[in-house]
Amino acid sequence: MKILFVGDASNFHNTLATALRRIGHEVTVVSDGSRWMDTVRDINLSRGAGLSGAVRYVWDVVKTLPRLRGYDVVHLVNPIFLSLRPGKVRLVFDYLRKHNRSVFLSALGSDYDYVKACVEGKLLKYSEYMLGDTPTEYMQSAEAAEERRNSWLSETLRKHQRYVMQGIDGAVACLYEYYYVDERIIPNKLAYGGIPIDTESIKPHYIEDEPEKVNFFIGIQRGRSIYKGTDKLLAAARRVVAKYPERSALRVVENLPYEEYLKQMSESHVILDQLYSYTPATNALIAMAQGLVAVSGAEPEYYDFIGENKCRPIINVSPLVDGDIDAKLEWIVQNKHLLPRLSHESREFVMRHNDYMVVAQRHEEFWKKILKAKYET
């Protein structure tokens, strides 16, 4: 098939494209390189600063449109898949629908439906916005209020979301929680794909013996700490290391270049990732592919959803239980003899559920099913 990815996030589409090319498909990625990550793309669409940057970006989009025709599958990164206002994005969406056989959506980040479900606090038991009926620290911030008012929950975004969801041929969710929200909106044209990890390029550094000290690792994204719950993970790790200084240590890095980040991560035993996720995300999965043990989201309903009953190596932490992070980190220190087994199981888990070839095949099967129903019935 001839496949076009429009937009990227955390190298998701580029990794998926690499796997699909290996299967034999012709794949093009057009994106801004996930902004600061500067990921690989075939066609660059990056928006510069100021009015001149905006004008140039619109011109680049218009100039690129003829190259975005004639594909069997167009896969969008988000309902807002370009750095444009919804009205202009809608025009490009209509163009893509008219000049290609199908248009799909990656459910892999915030959009109107997901943020609405989080903010209402009824569908999901917790999120970055709510802990049951209680607003999170981020939810109470000025940033979140501005986001709800002028961004994801605006009337303009609601209308745009409805238009896109009605117009796409299907959507593929990368996380359990995105699937859980979207199956109530588009149940008949939704699939689960997972996050693709290029395990072939990641050399495992297994924990072969019980370490004298457990080396915890946490990466801080400036400006995203409260949103991801990294602030709470960091505080708990510091308390545990202070309590067990002879048996544990903590390395904290902030805004490192990606390659240096991976290098420092590989020298650790346990990575602390996200607090408000039901599903291990890209950072945790890459660490697990290296043989690290991840402290992250991995709720029982996620494991049940993917049909995994035996290999459950992720240390799940709950934001709903007071002291849960401290307790789980203390458990790791007190049971560090289990780290070699968890290390091997972590890599095994990623190979089984998130290897980029596995995720690519899930996408391929779903696309073919939808195309067959659309054109052969």
Label each residue range with its predicted role.
Residues 336-368:
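A charged, aromatic-enriched C-terminal amphipathic alpha-helix characteristic of glycosyltransferases
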Residues 189-228, 234:
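Conserved donor-binding/catalytic core segment of Leloir-type glycosyltransferases
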Residues 114-115, 141-142, 147-190, 235:
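A short, active-site helix/loop in glycosyltransferases that binds the activated sugar's phosphate group
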Residues 266-279, 292:
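Acidic donor-binding loop of glycosyltransferase active sites
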Residues 2-6, 66-88, 102-106:
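Short N-terminal targeting/anchoring amphipathic segment
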Residues 39-42, 105-155, 223, 299, ...:
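Acceptor-binding helix/loop patch of EC 2.4 sugar-transfer enzymes
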Residues 293-300:
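Short hydrophobic beta-strand element within catalytic cores of glycosyltransferases
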